[in-house]
Curated annotation (Swiss-Prot):
Keywords: Calcium, Cytoplasm. GO terms for cellular component: cytoplasm. Its main location: cytoplasm. Residues 1-170 form the TCTP domain. GO terms for molecular function: calcium ion binding. Disulfide bonds: none annotated. The gene is tpt1. It holds the Pfam family TCTP. Belongs to the TCTP family. It is found in: Cytoplasm. Involved in calcium binding and microtubule stabilization. This is Translationally-controlled tumor protein homolog. It comes from Lateolabrax japonicus (Japanese sea perch). PROSITE patterns: TCTP_2, TCTP_3.
Length: 170
């Protein structure tokens, strides 16, 4: 299995357990997800108590969680942006990715910088369509994944900047 981690925060963003493809210009990974509902039950046998000494038996509560499987599996945390705050974030994020690329993959810098401006403009034009998710540690300098839905309105997918990720085999 391959886990994709943010190169800035080290947070897990997604894995190859999902359908992953590159966007047309290769700047994003598009990760297809599914809406799922999970029940988190607590095993009563794990609660240390003498059941025979109890007068009444209380059942432990279970919780039901619904959401996109990518978000739930990798414990992504929802955050929010308006146009102004996203511009501030993305400017700093692109600068950080450019710096990392200069250190580790200098041949990618020009292509990344050429493509990112056009993609950011597209994101800003459709900002109202996206939900934003950070990694589990909610590092404000780390990657923010963009959640949107396909044309059918029911199939969720997320966009992650390819150059902001480190692929790690498990």
């Amino acid at each position: 299995m391959i886990i994709y981690k943010c190169i800035i925060s080290g947070d897990e963003m997604f894995s190859d357990a999902f359908k992953v493809k590159e966007s047309a210009n290769g700047i994003f990974y598009e990760v297809d997800g599914k809406i799922t509902t999970r029940t988190d039950n607590i095993d009563d046998s794990l609660i240390s108590a003498n059941a025979s000494a109890e007068e009444t038996t209380d059942c432990t509560d279970s919780s039901v969680v619904s959401g996109v499987d990518i978000v739930l599996n990798h414990k992504l945390q929802e955050t929010s942006f308006d146009k102004k705050s996203y511009k501030v974030y993305i400017k700093d994020y692109v600068k950080a990715i450019k710096q990392k690329l200069q250190e580790e993959k200098p041949e990618r810098v020009d292509a990344f910088m050429a493509d990112v401006a056009e993609e950011v403009k597209e994101i800003l034009n459709n900002l109202k369509n996206y939900q934003f998710f950070t990694g589990e540690n909610m590092n404000p300098e780390g990657m923010v994944g963009l959640l949107d839905y396909r044309e059918d309105g029911t199939t969720p997918y997320m966009l992650f900047f390819k150059d902001g990720l480190l692929a790690e085999k498990c």
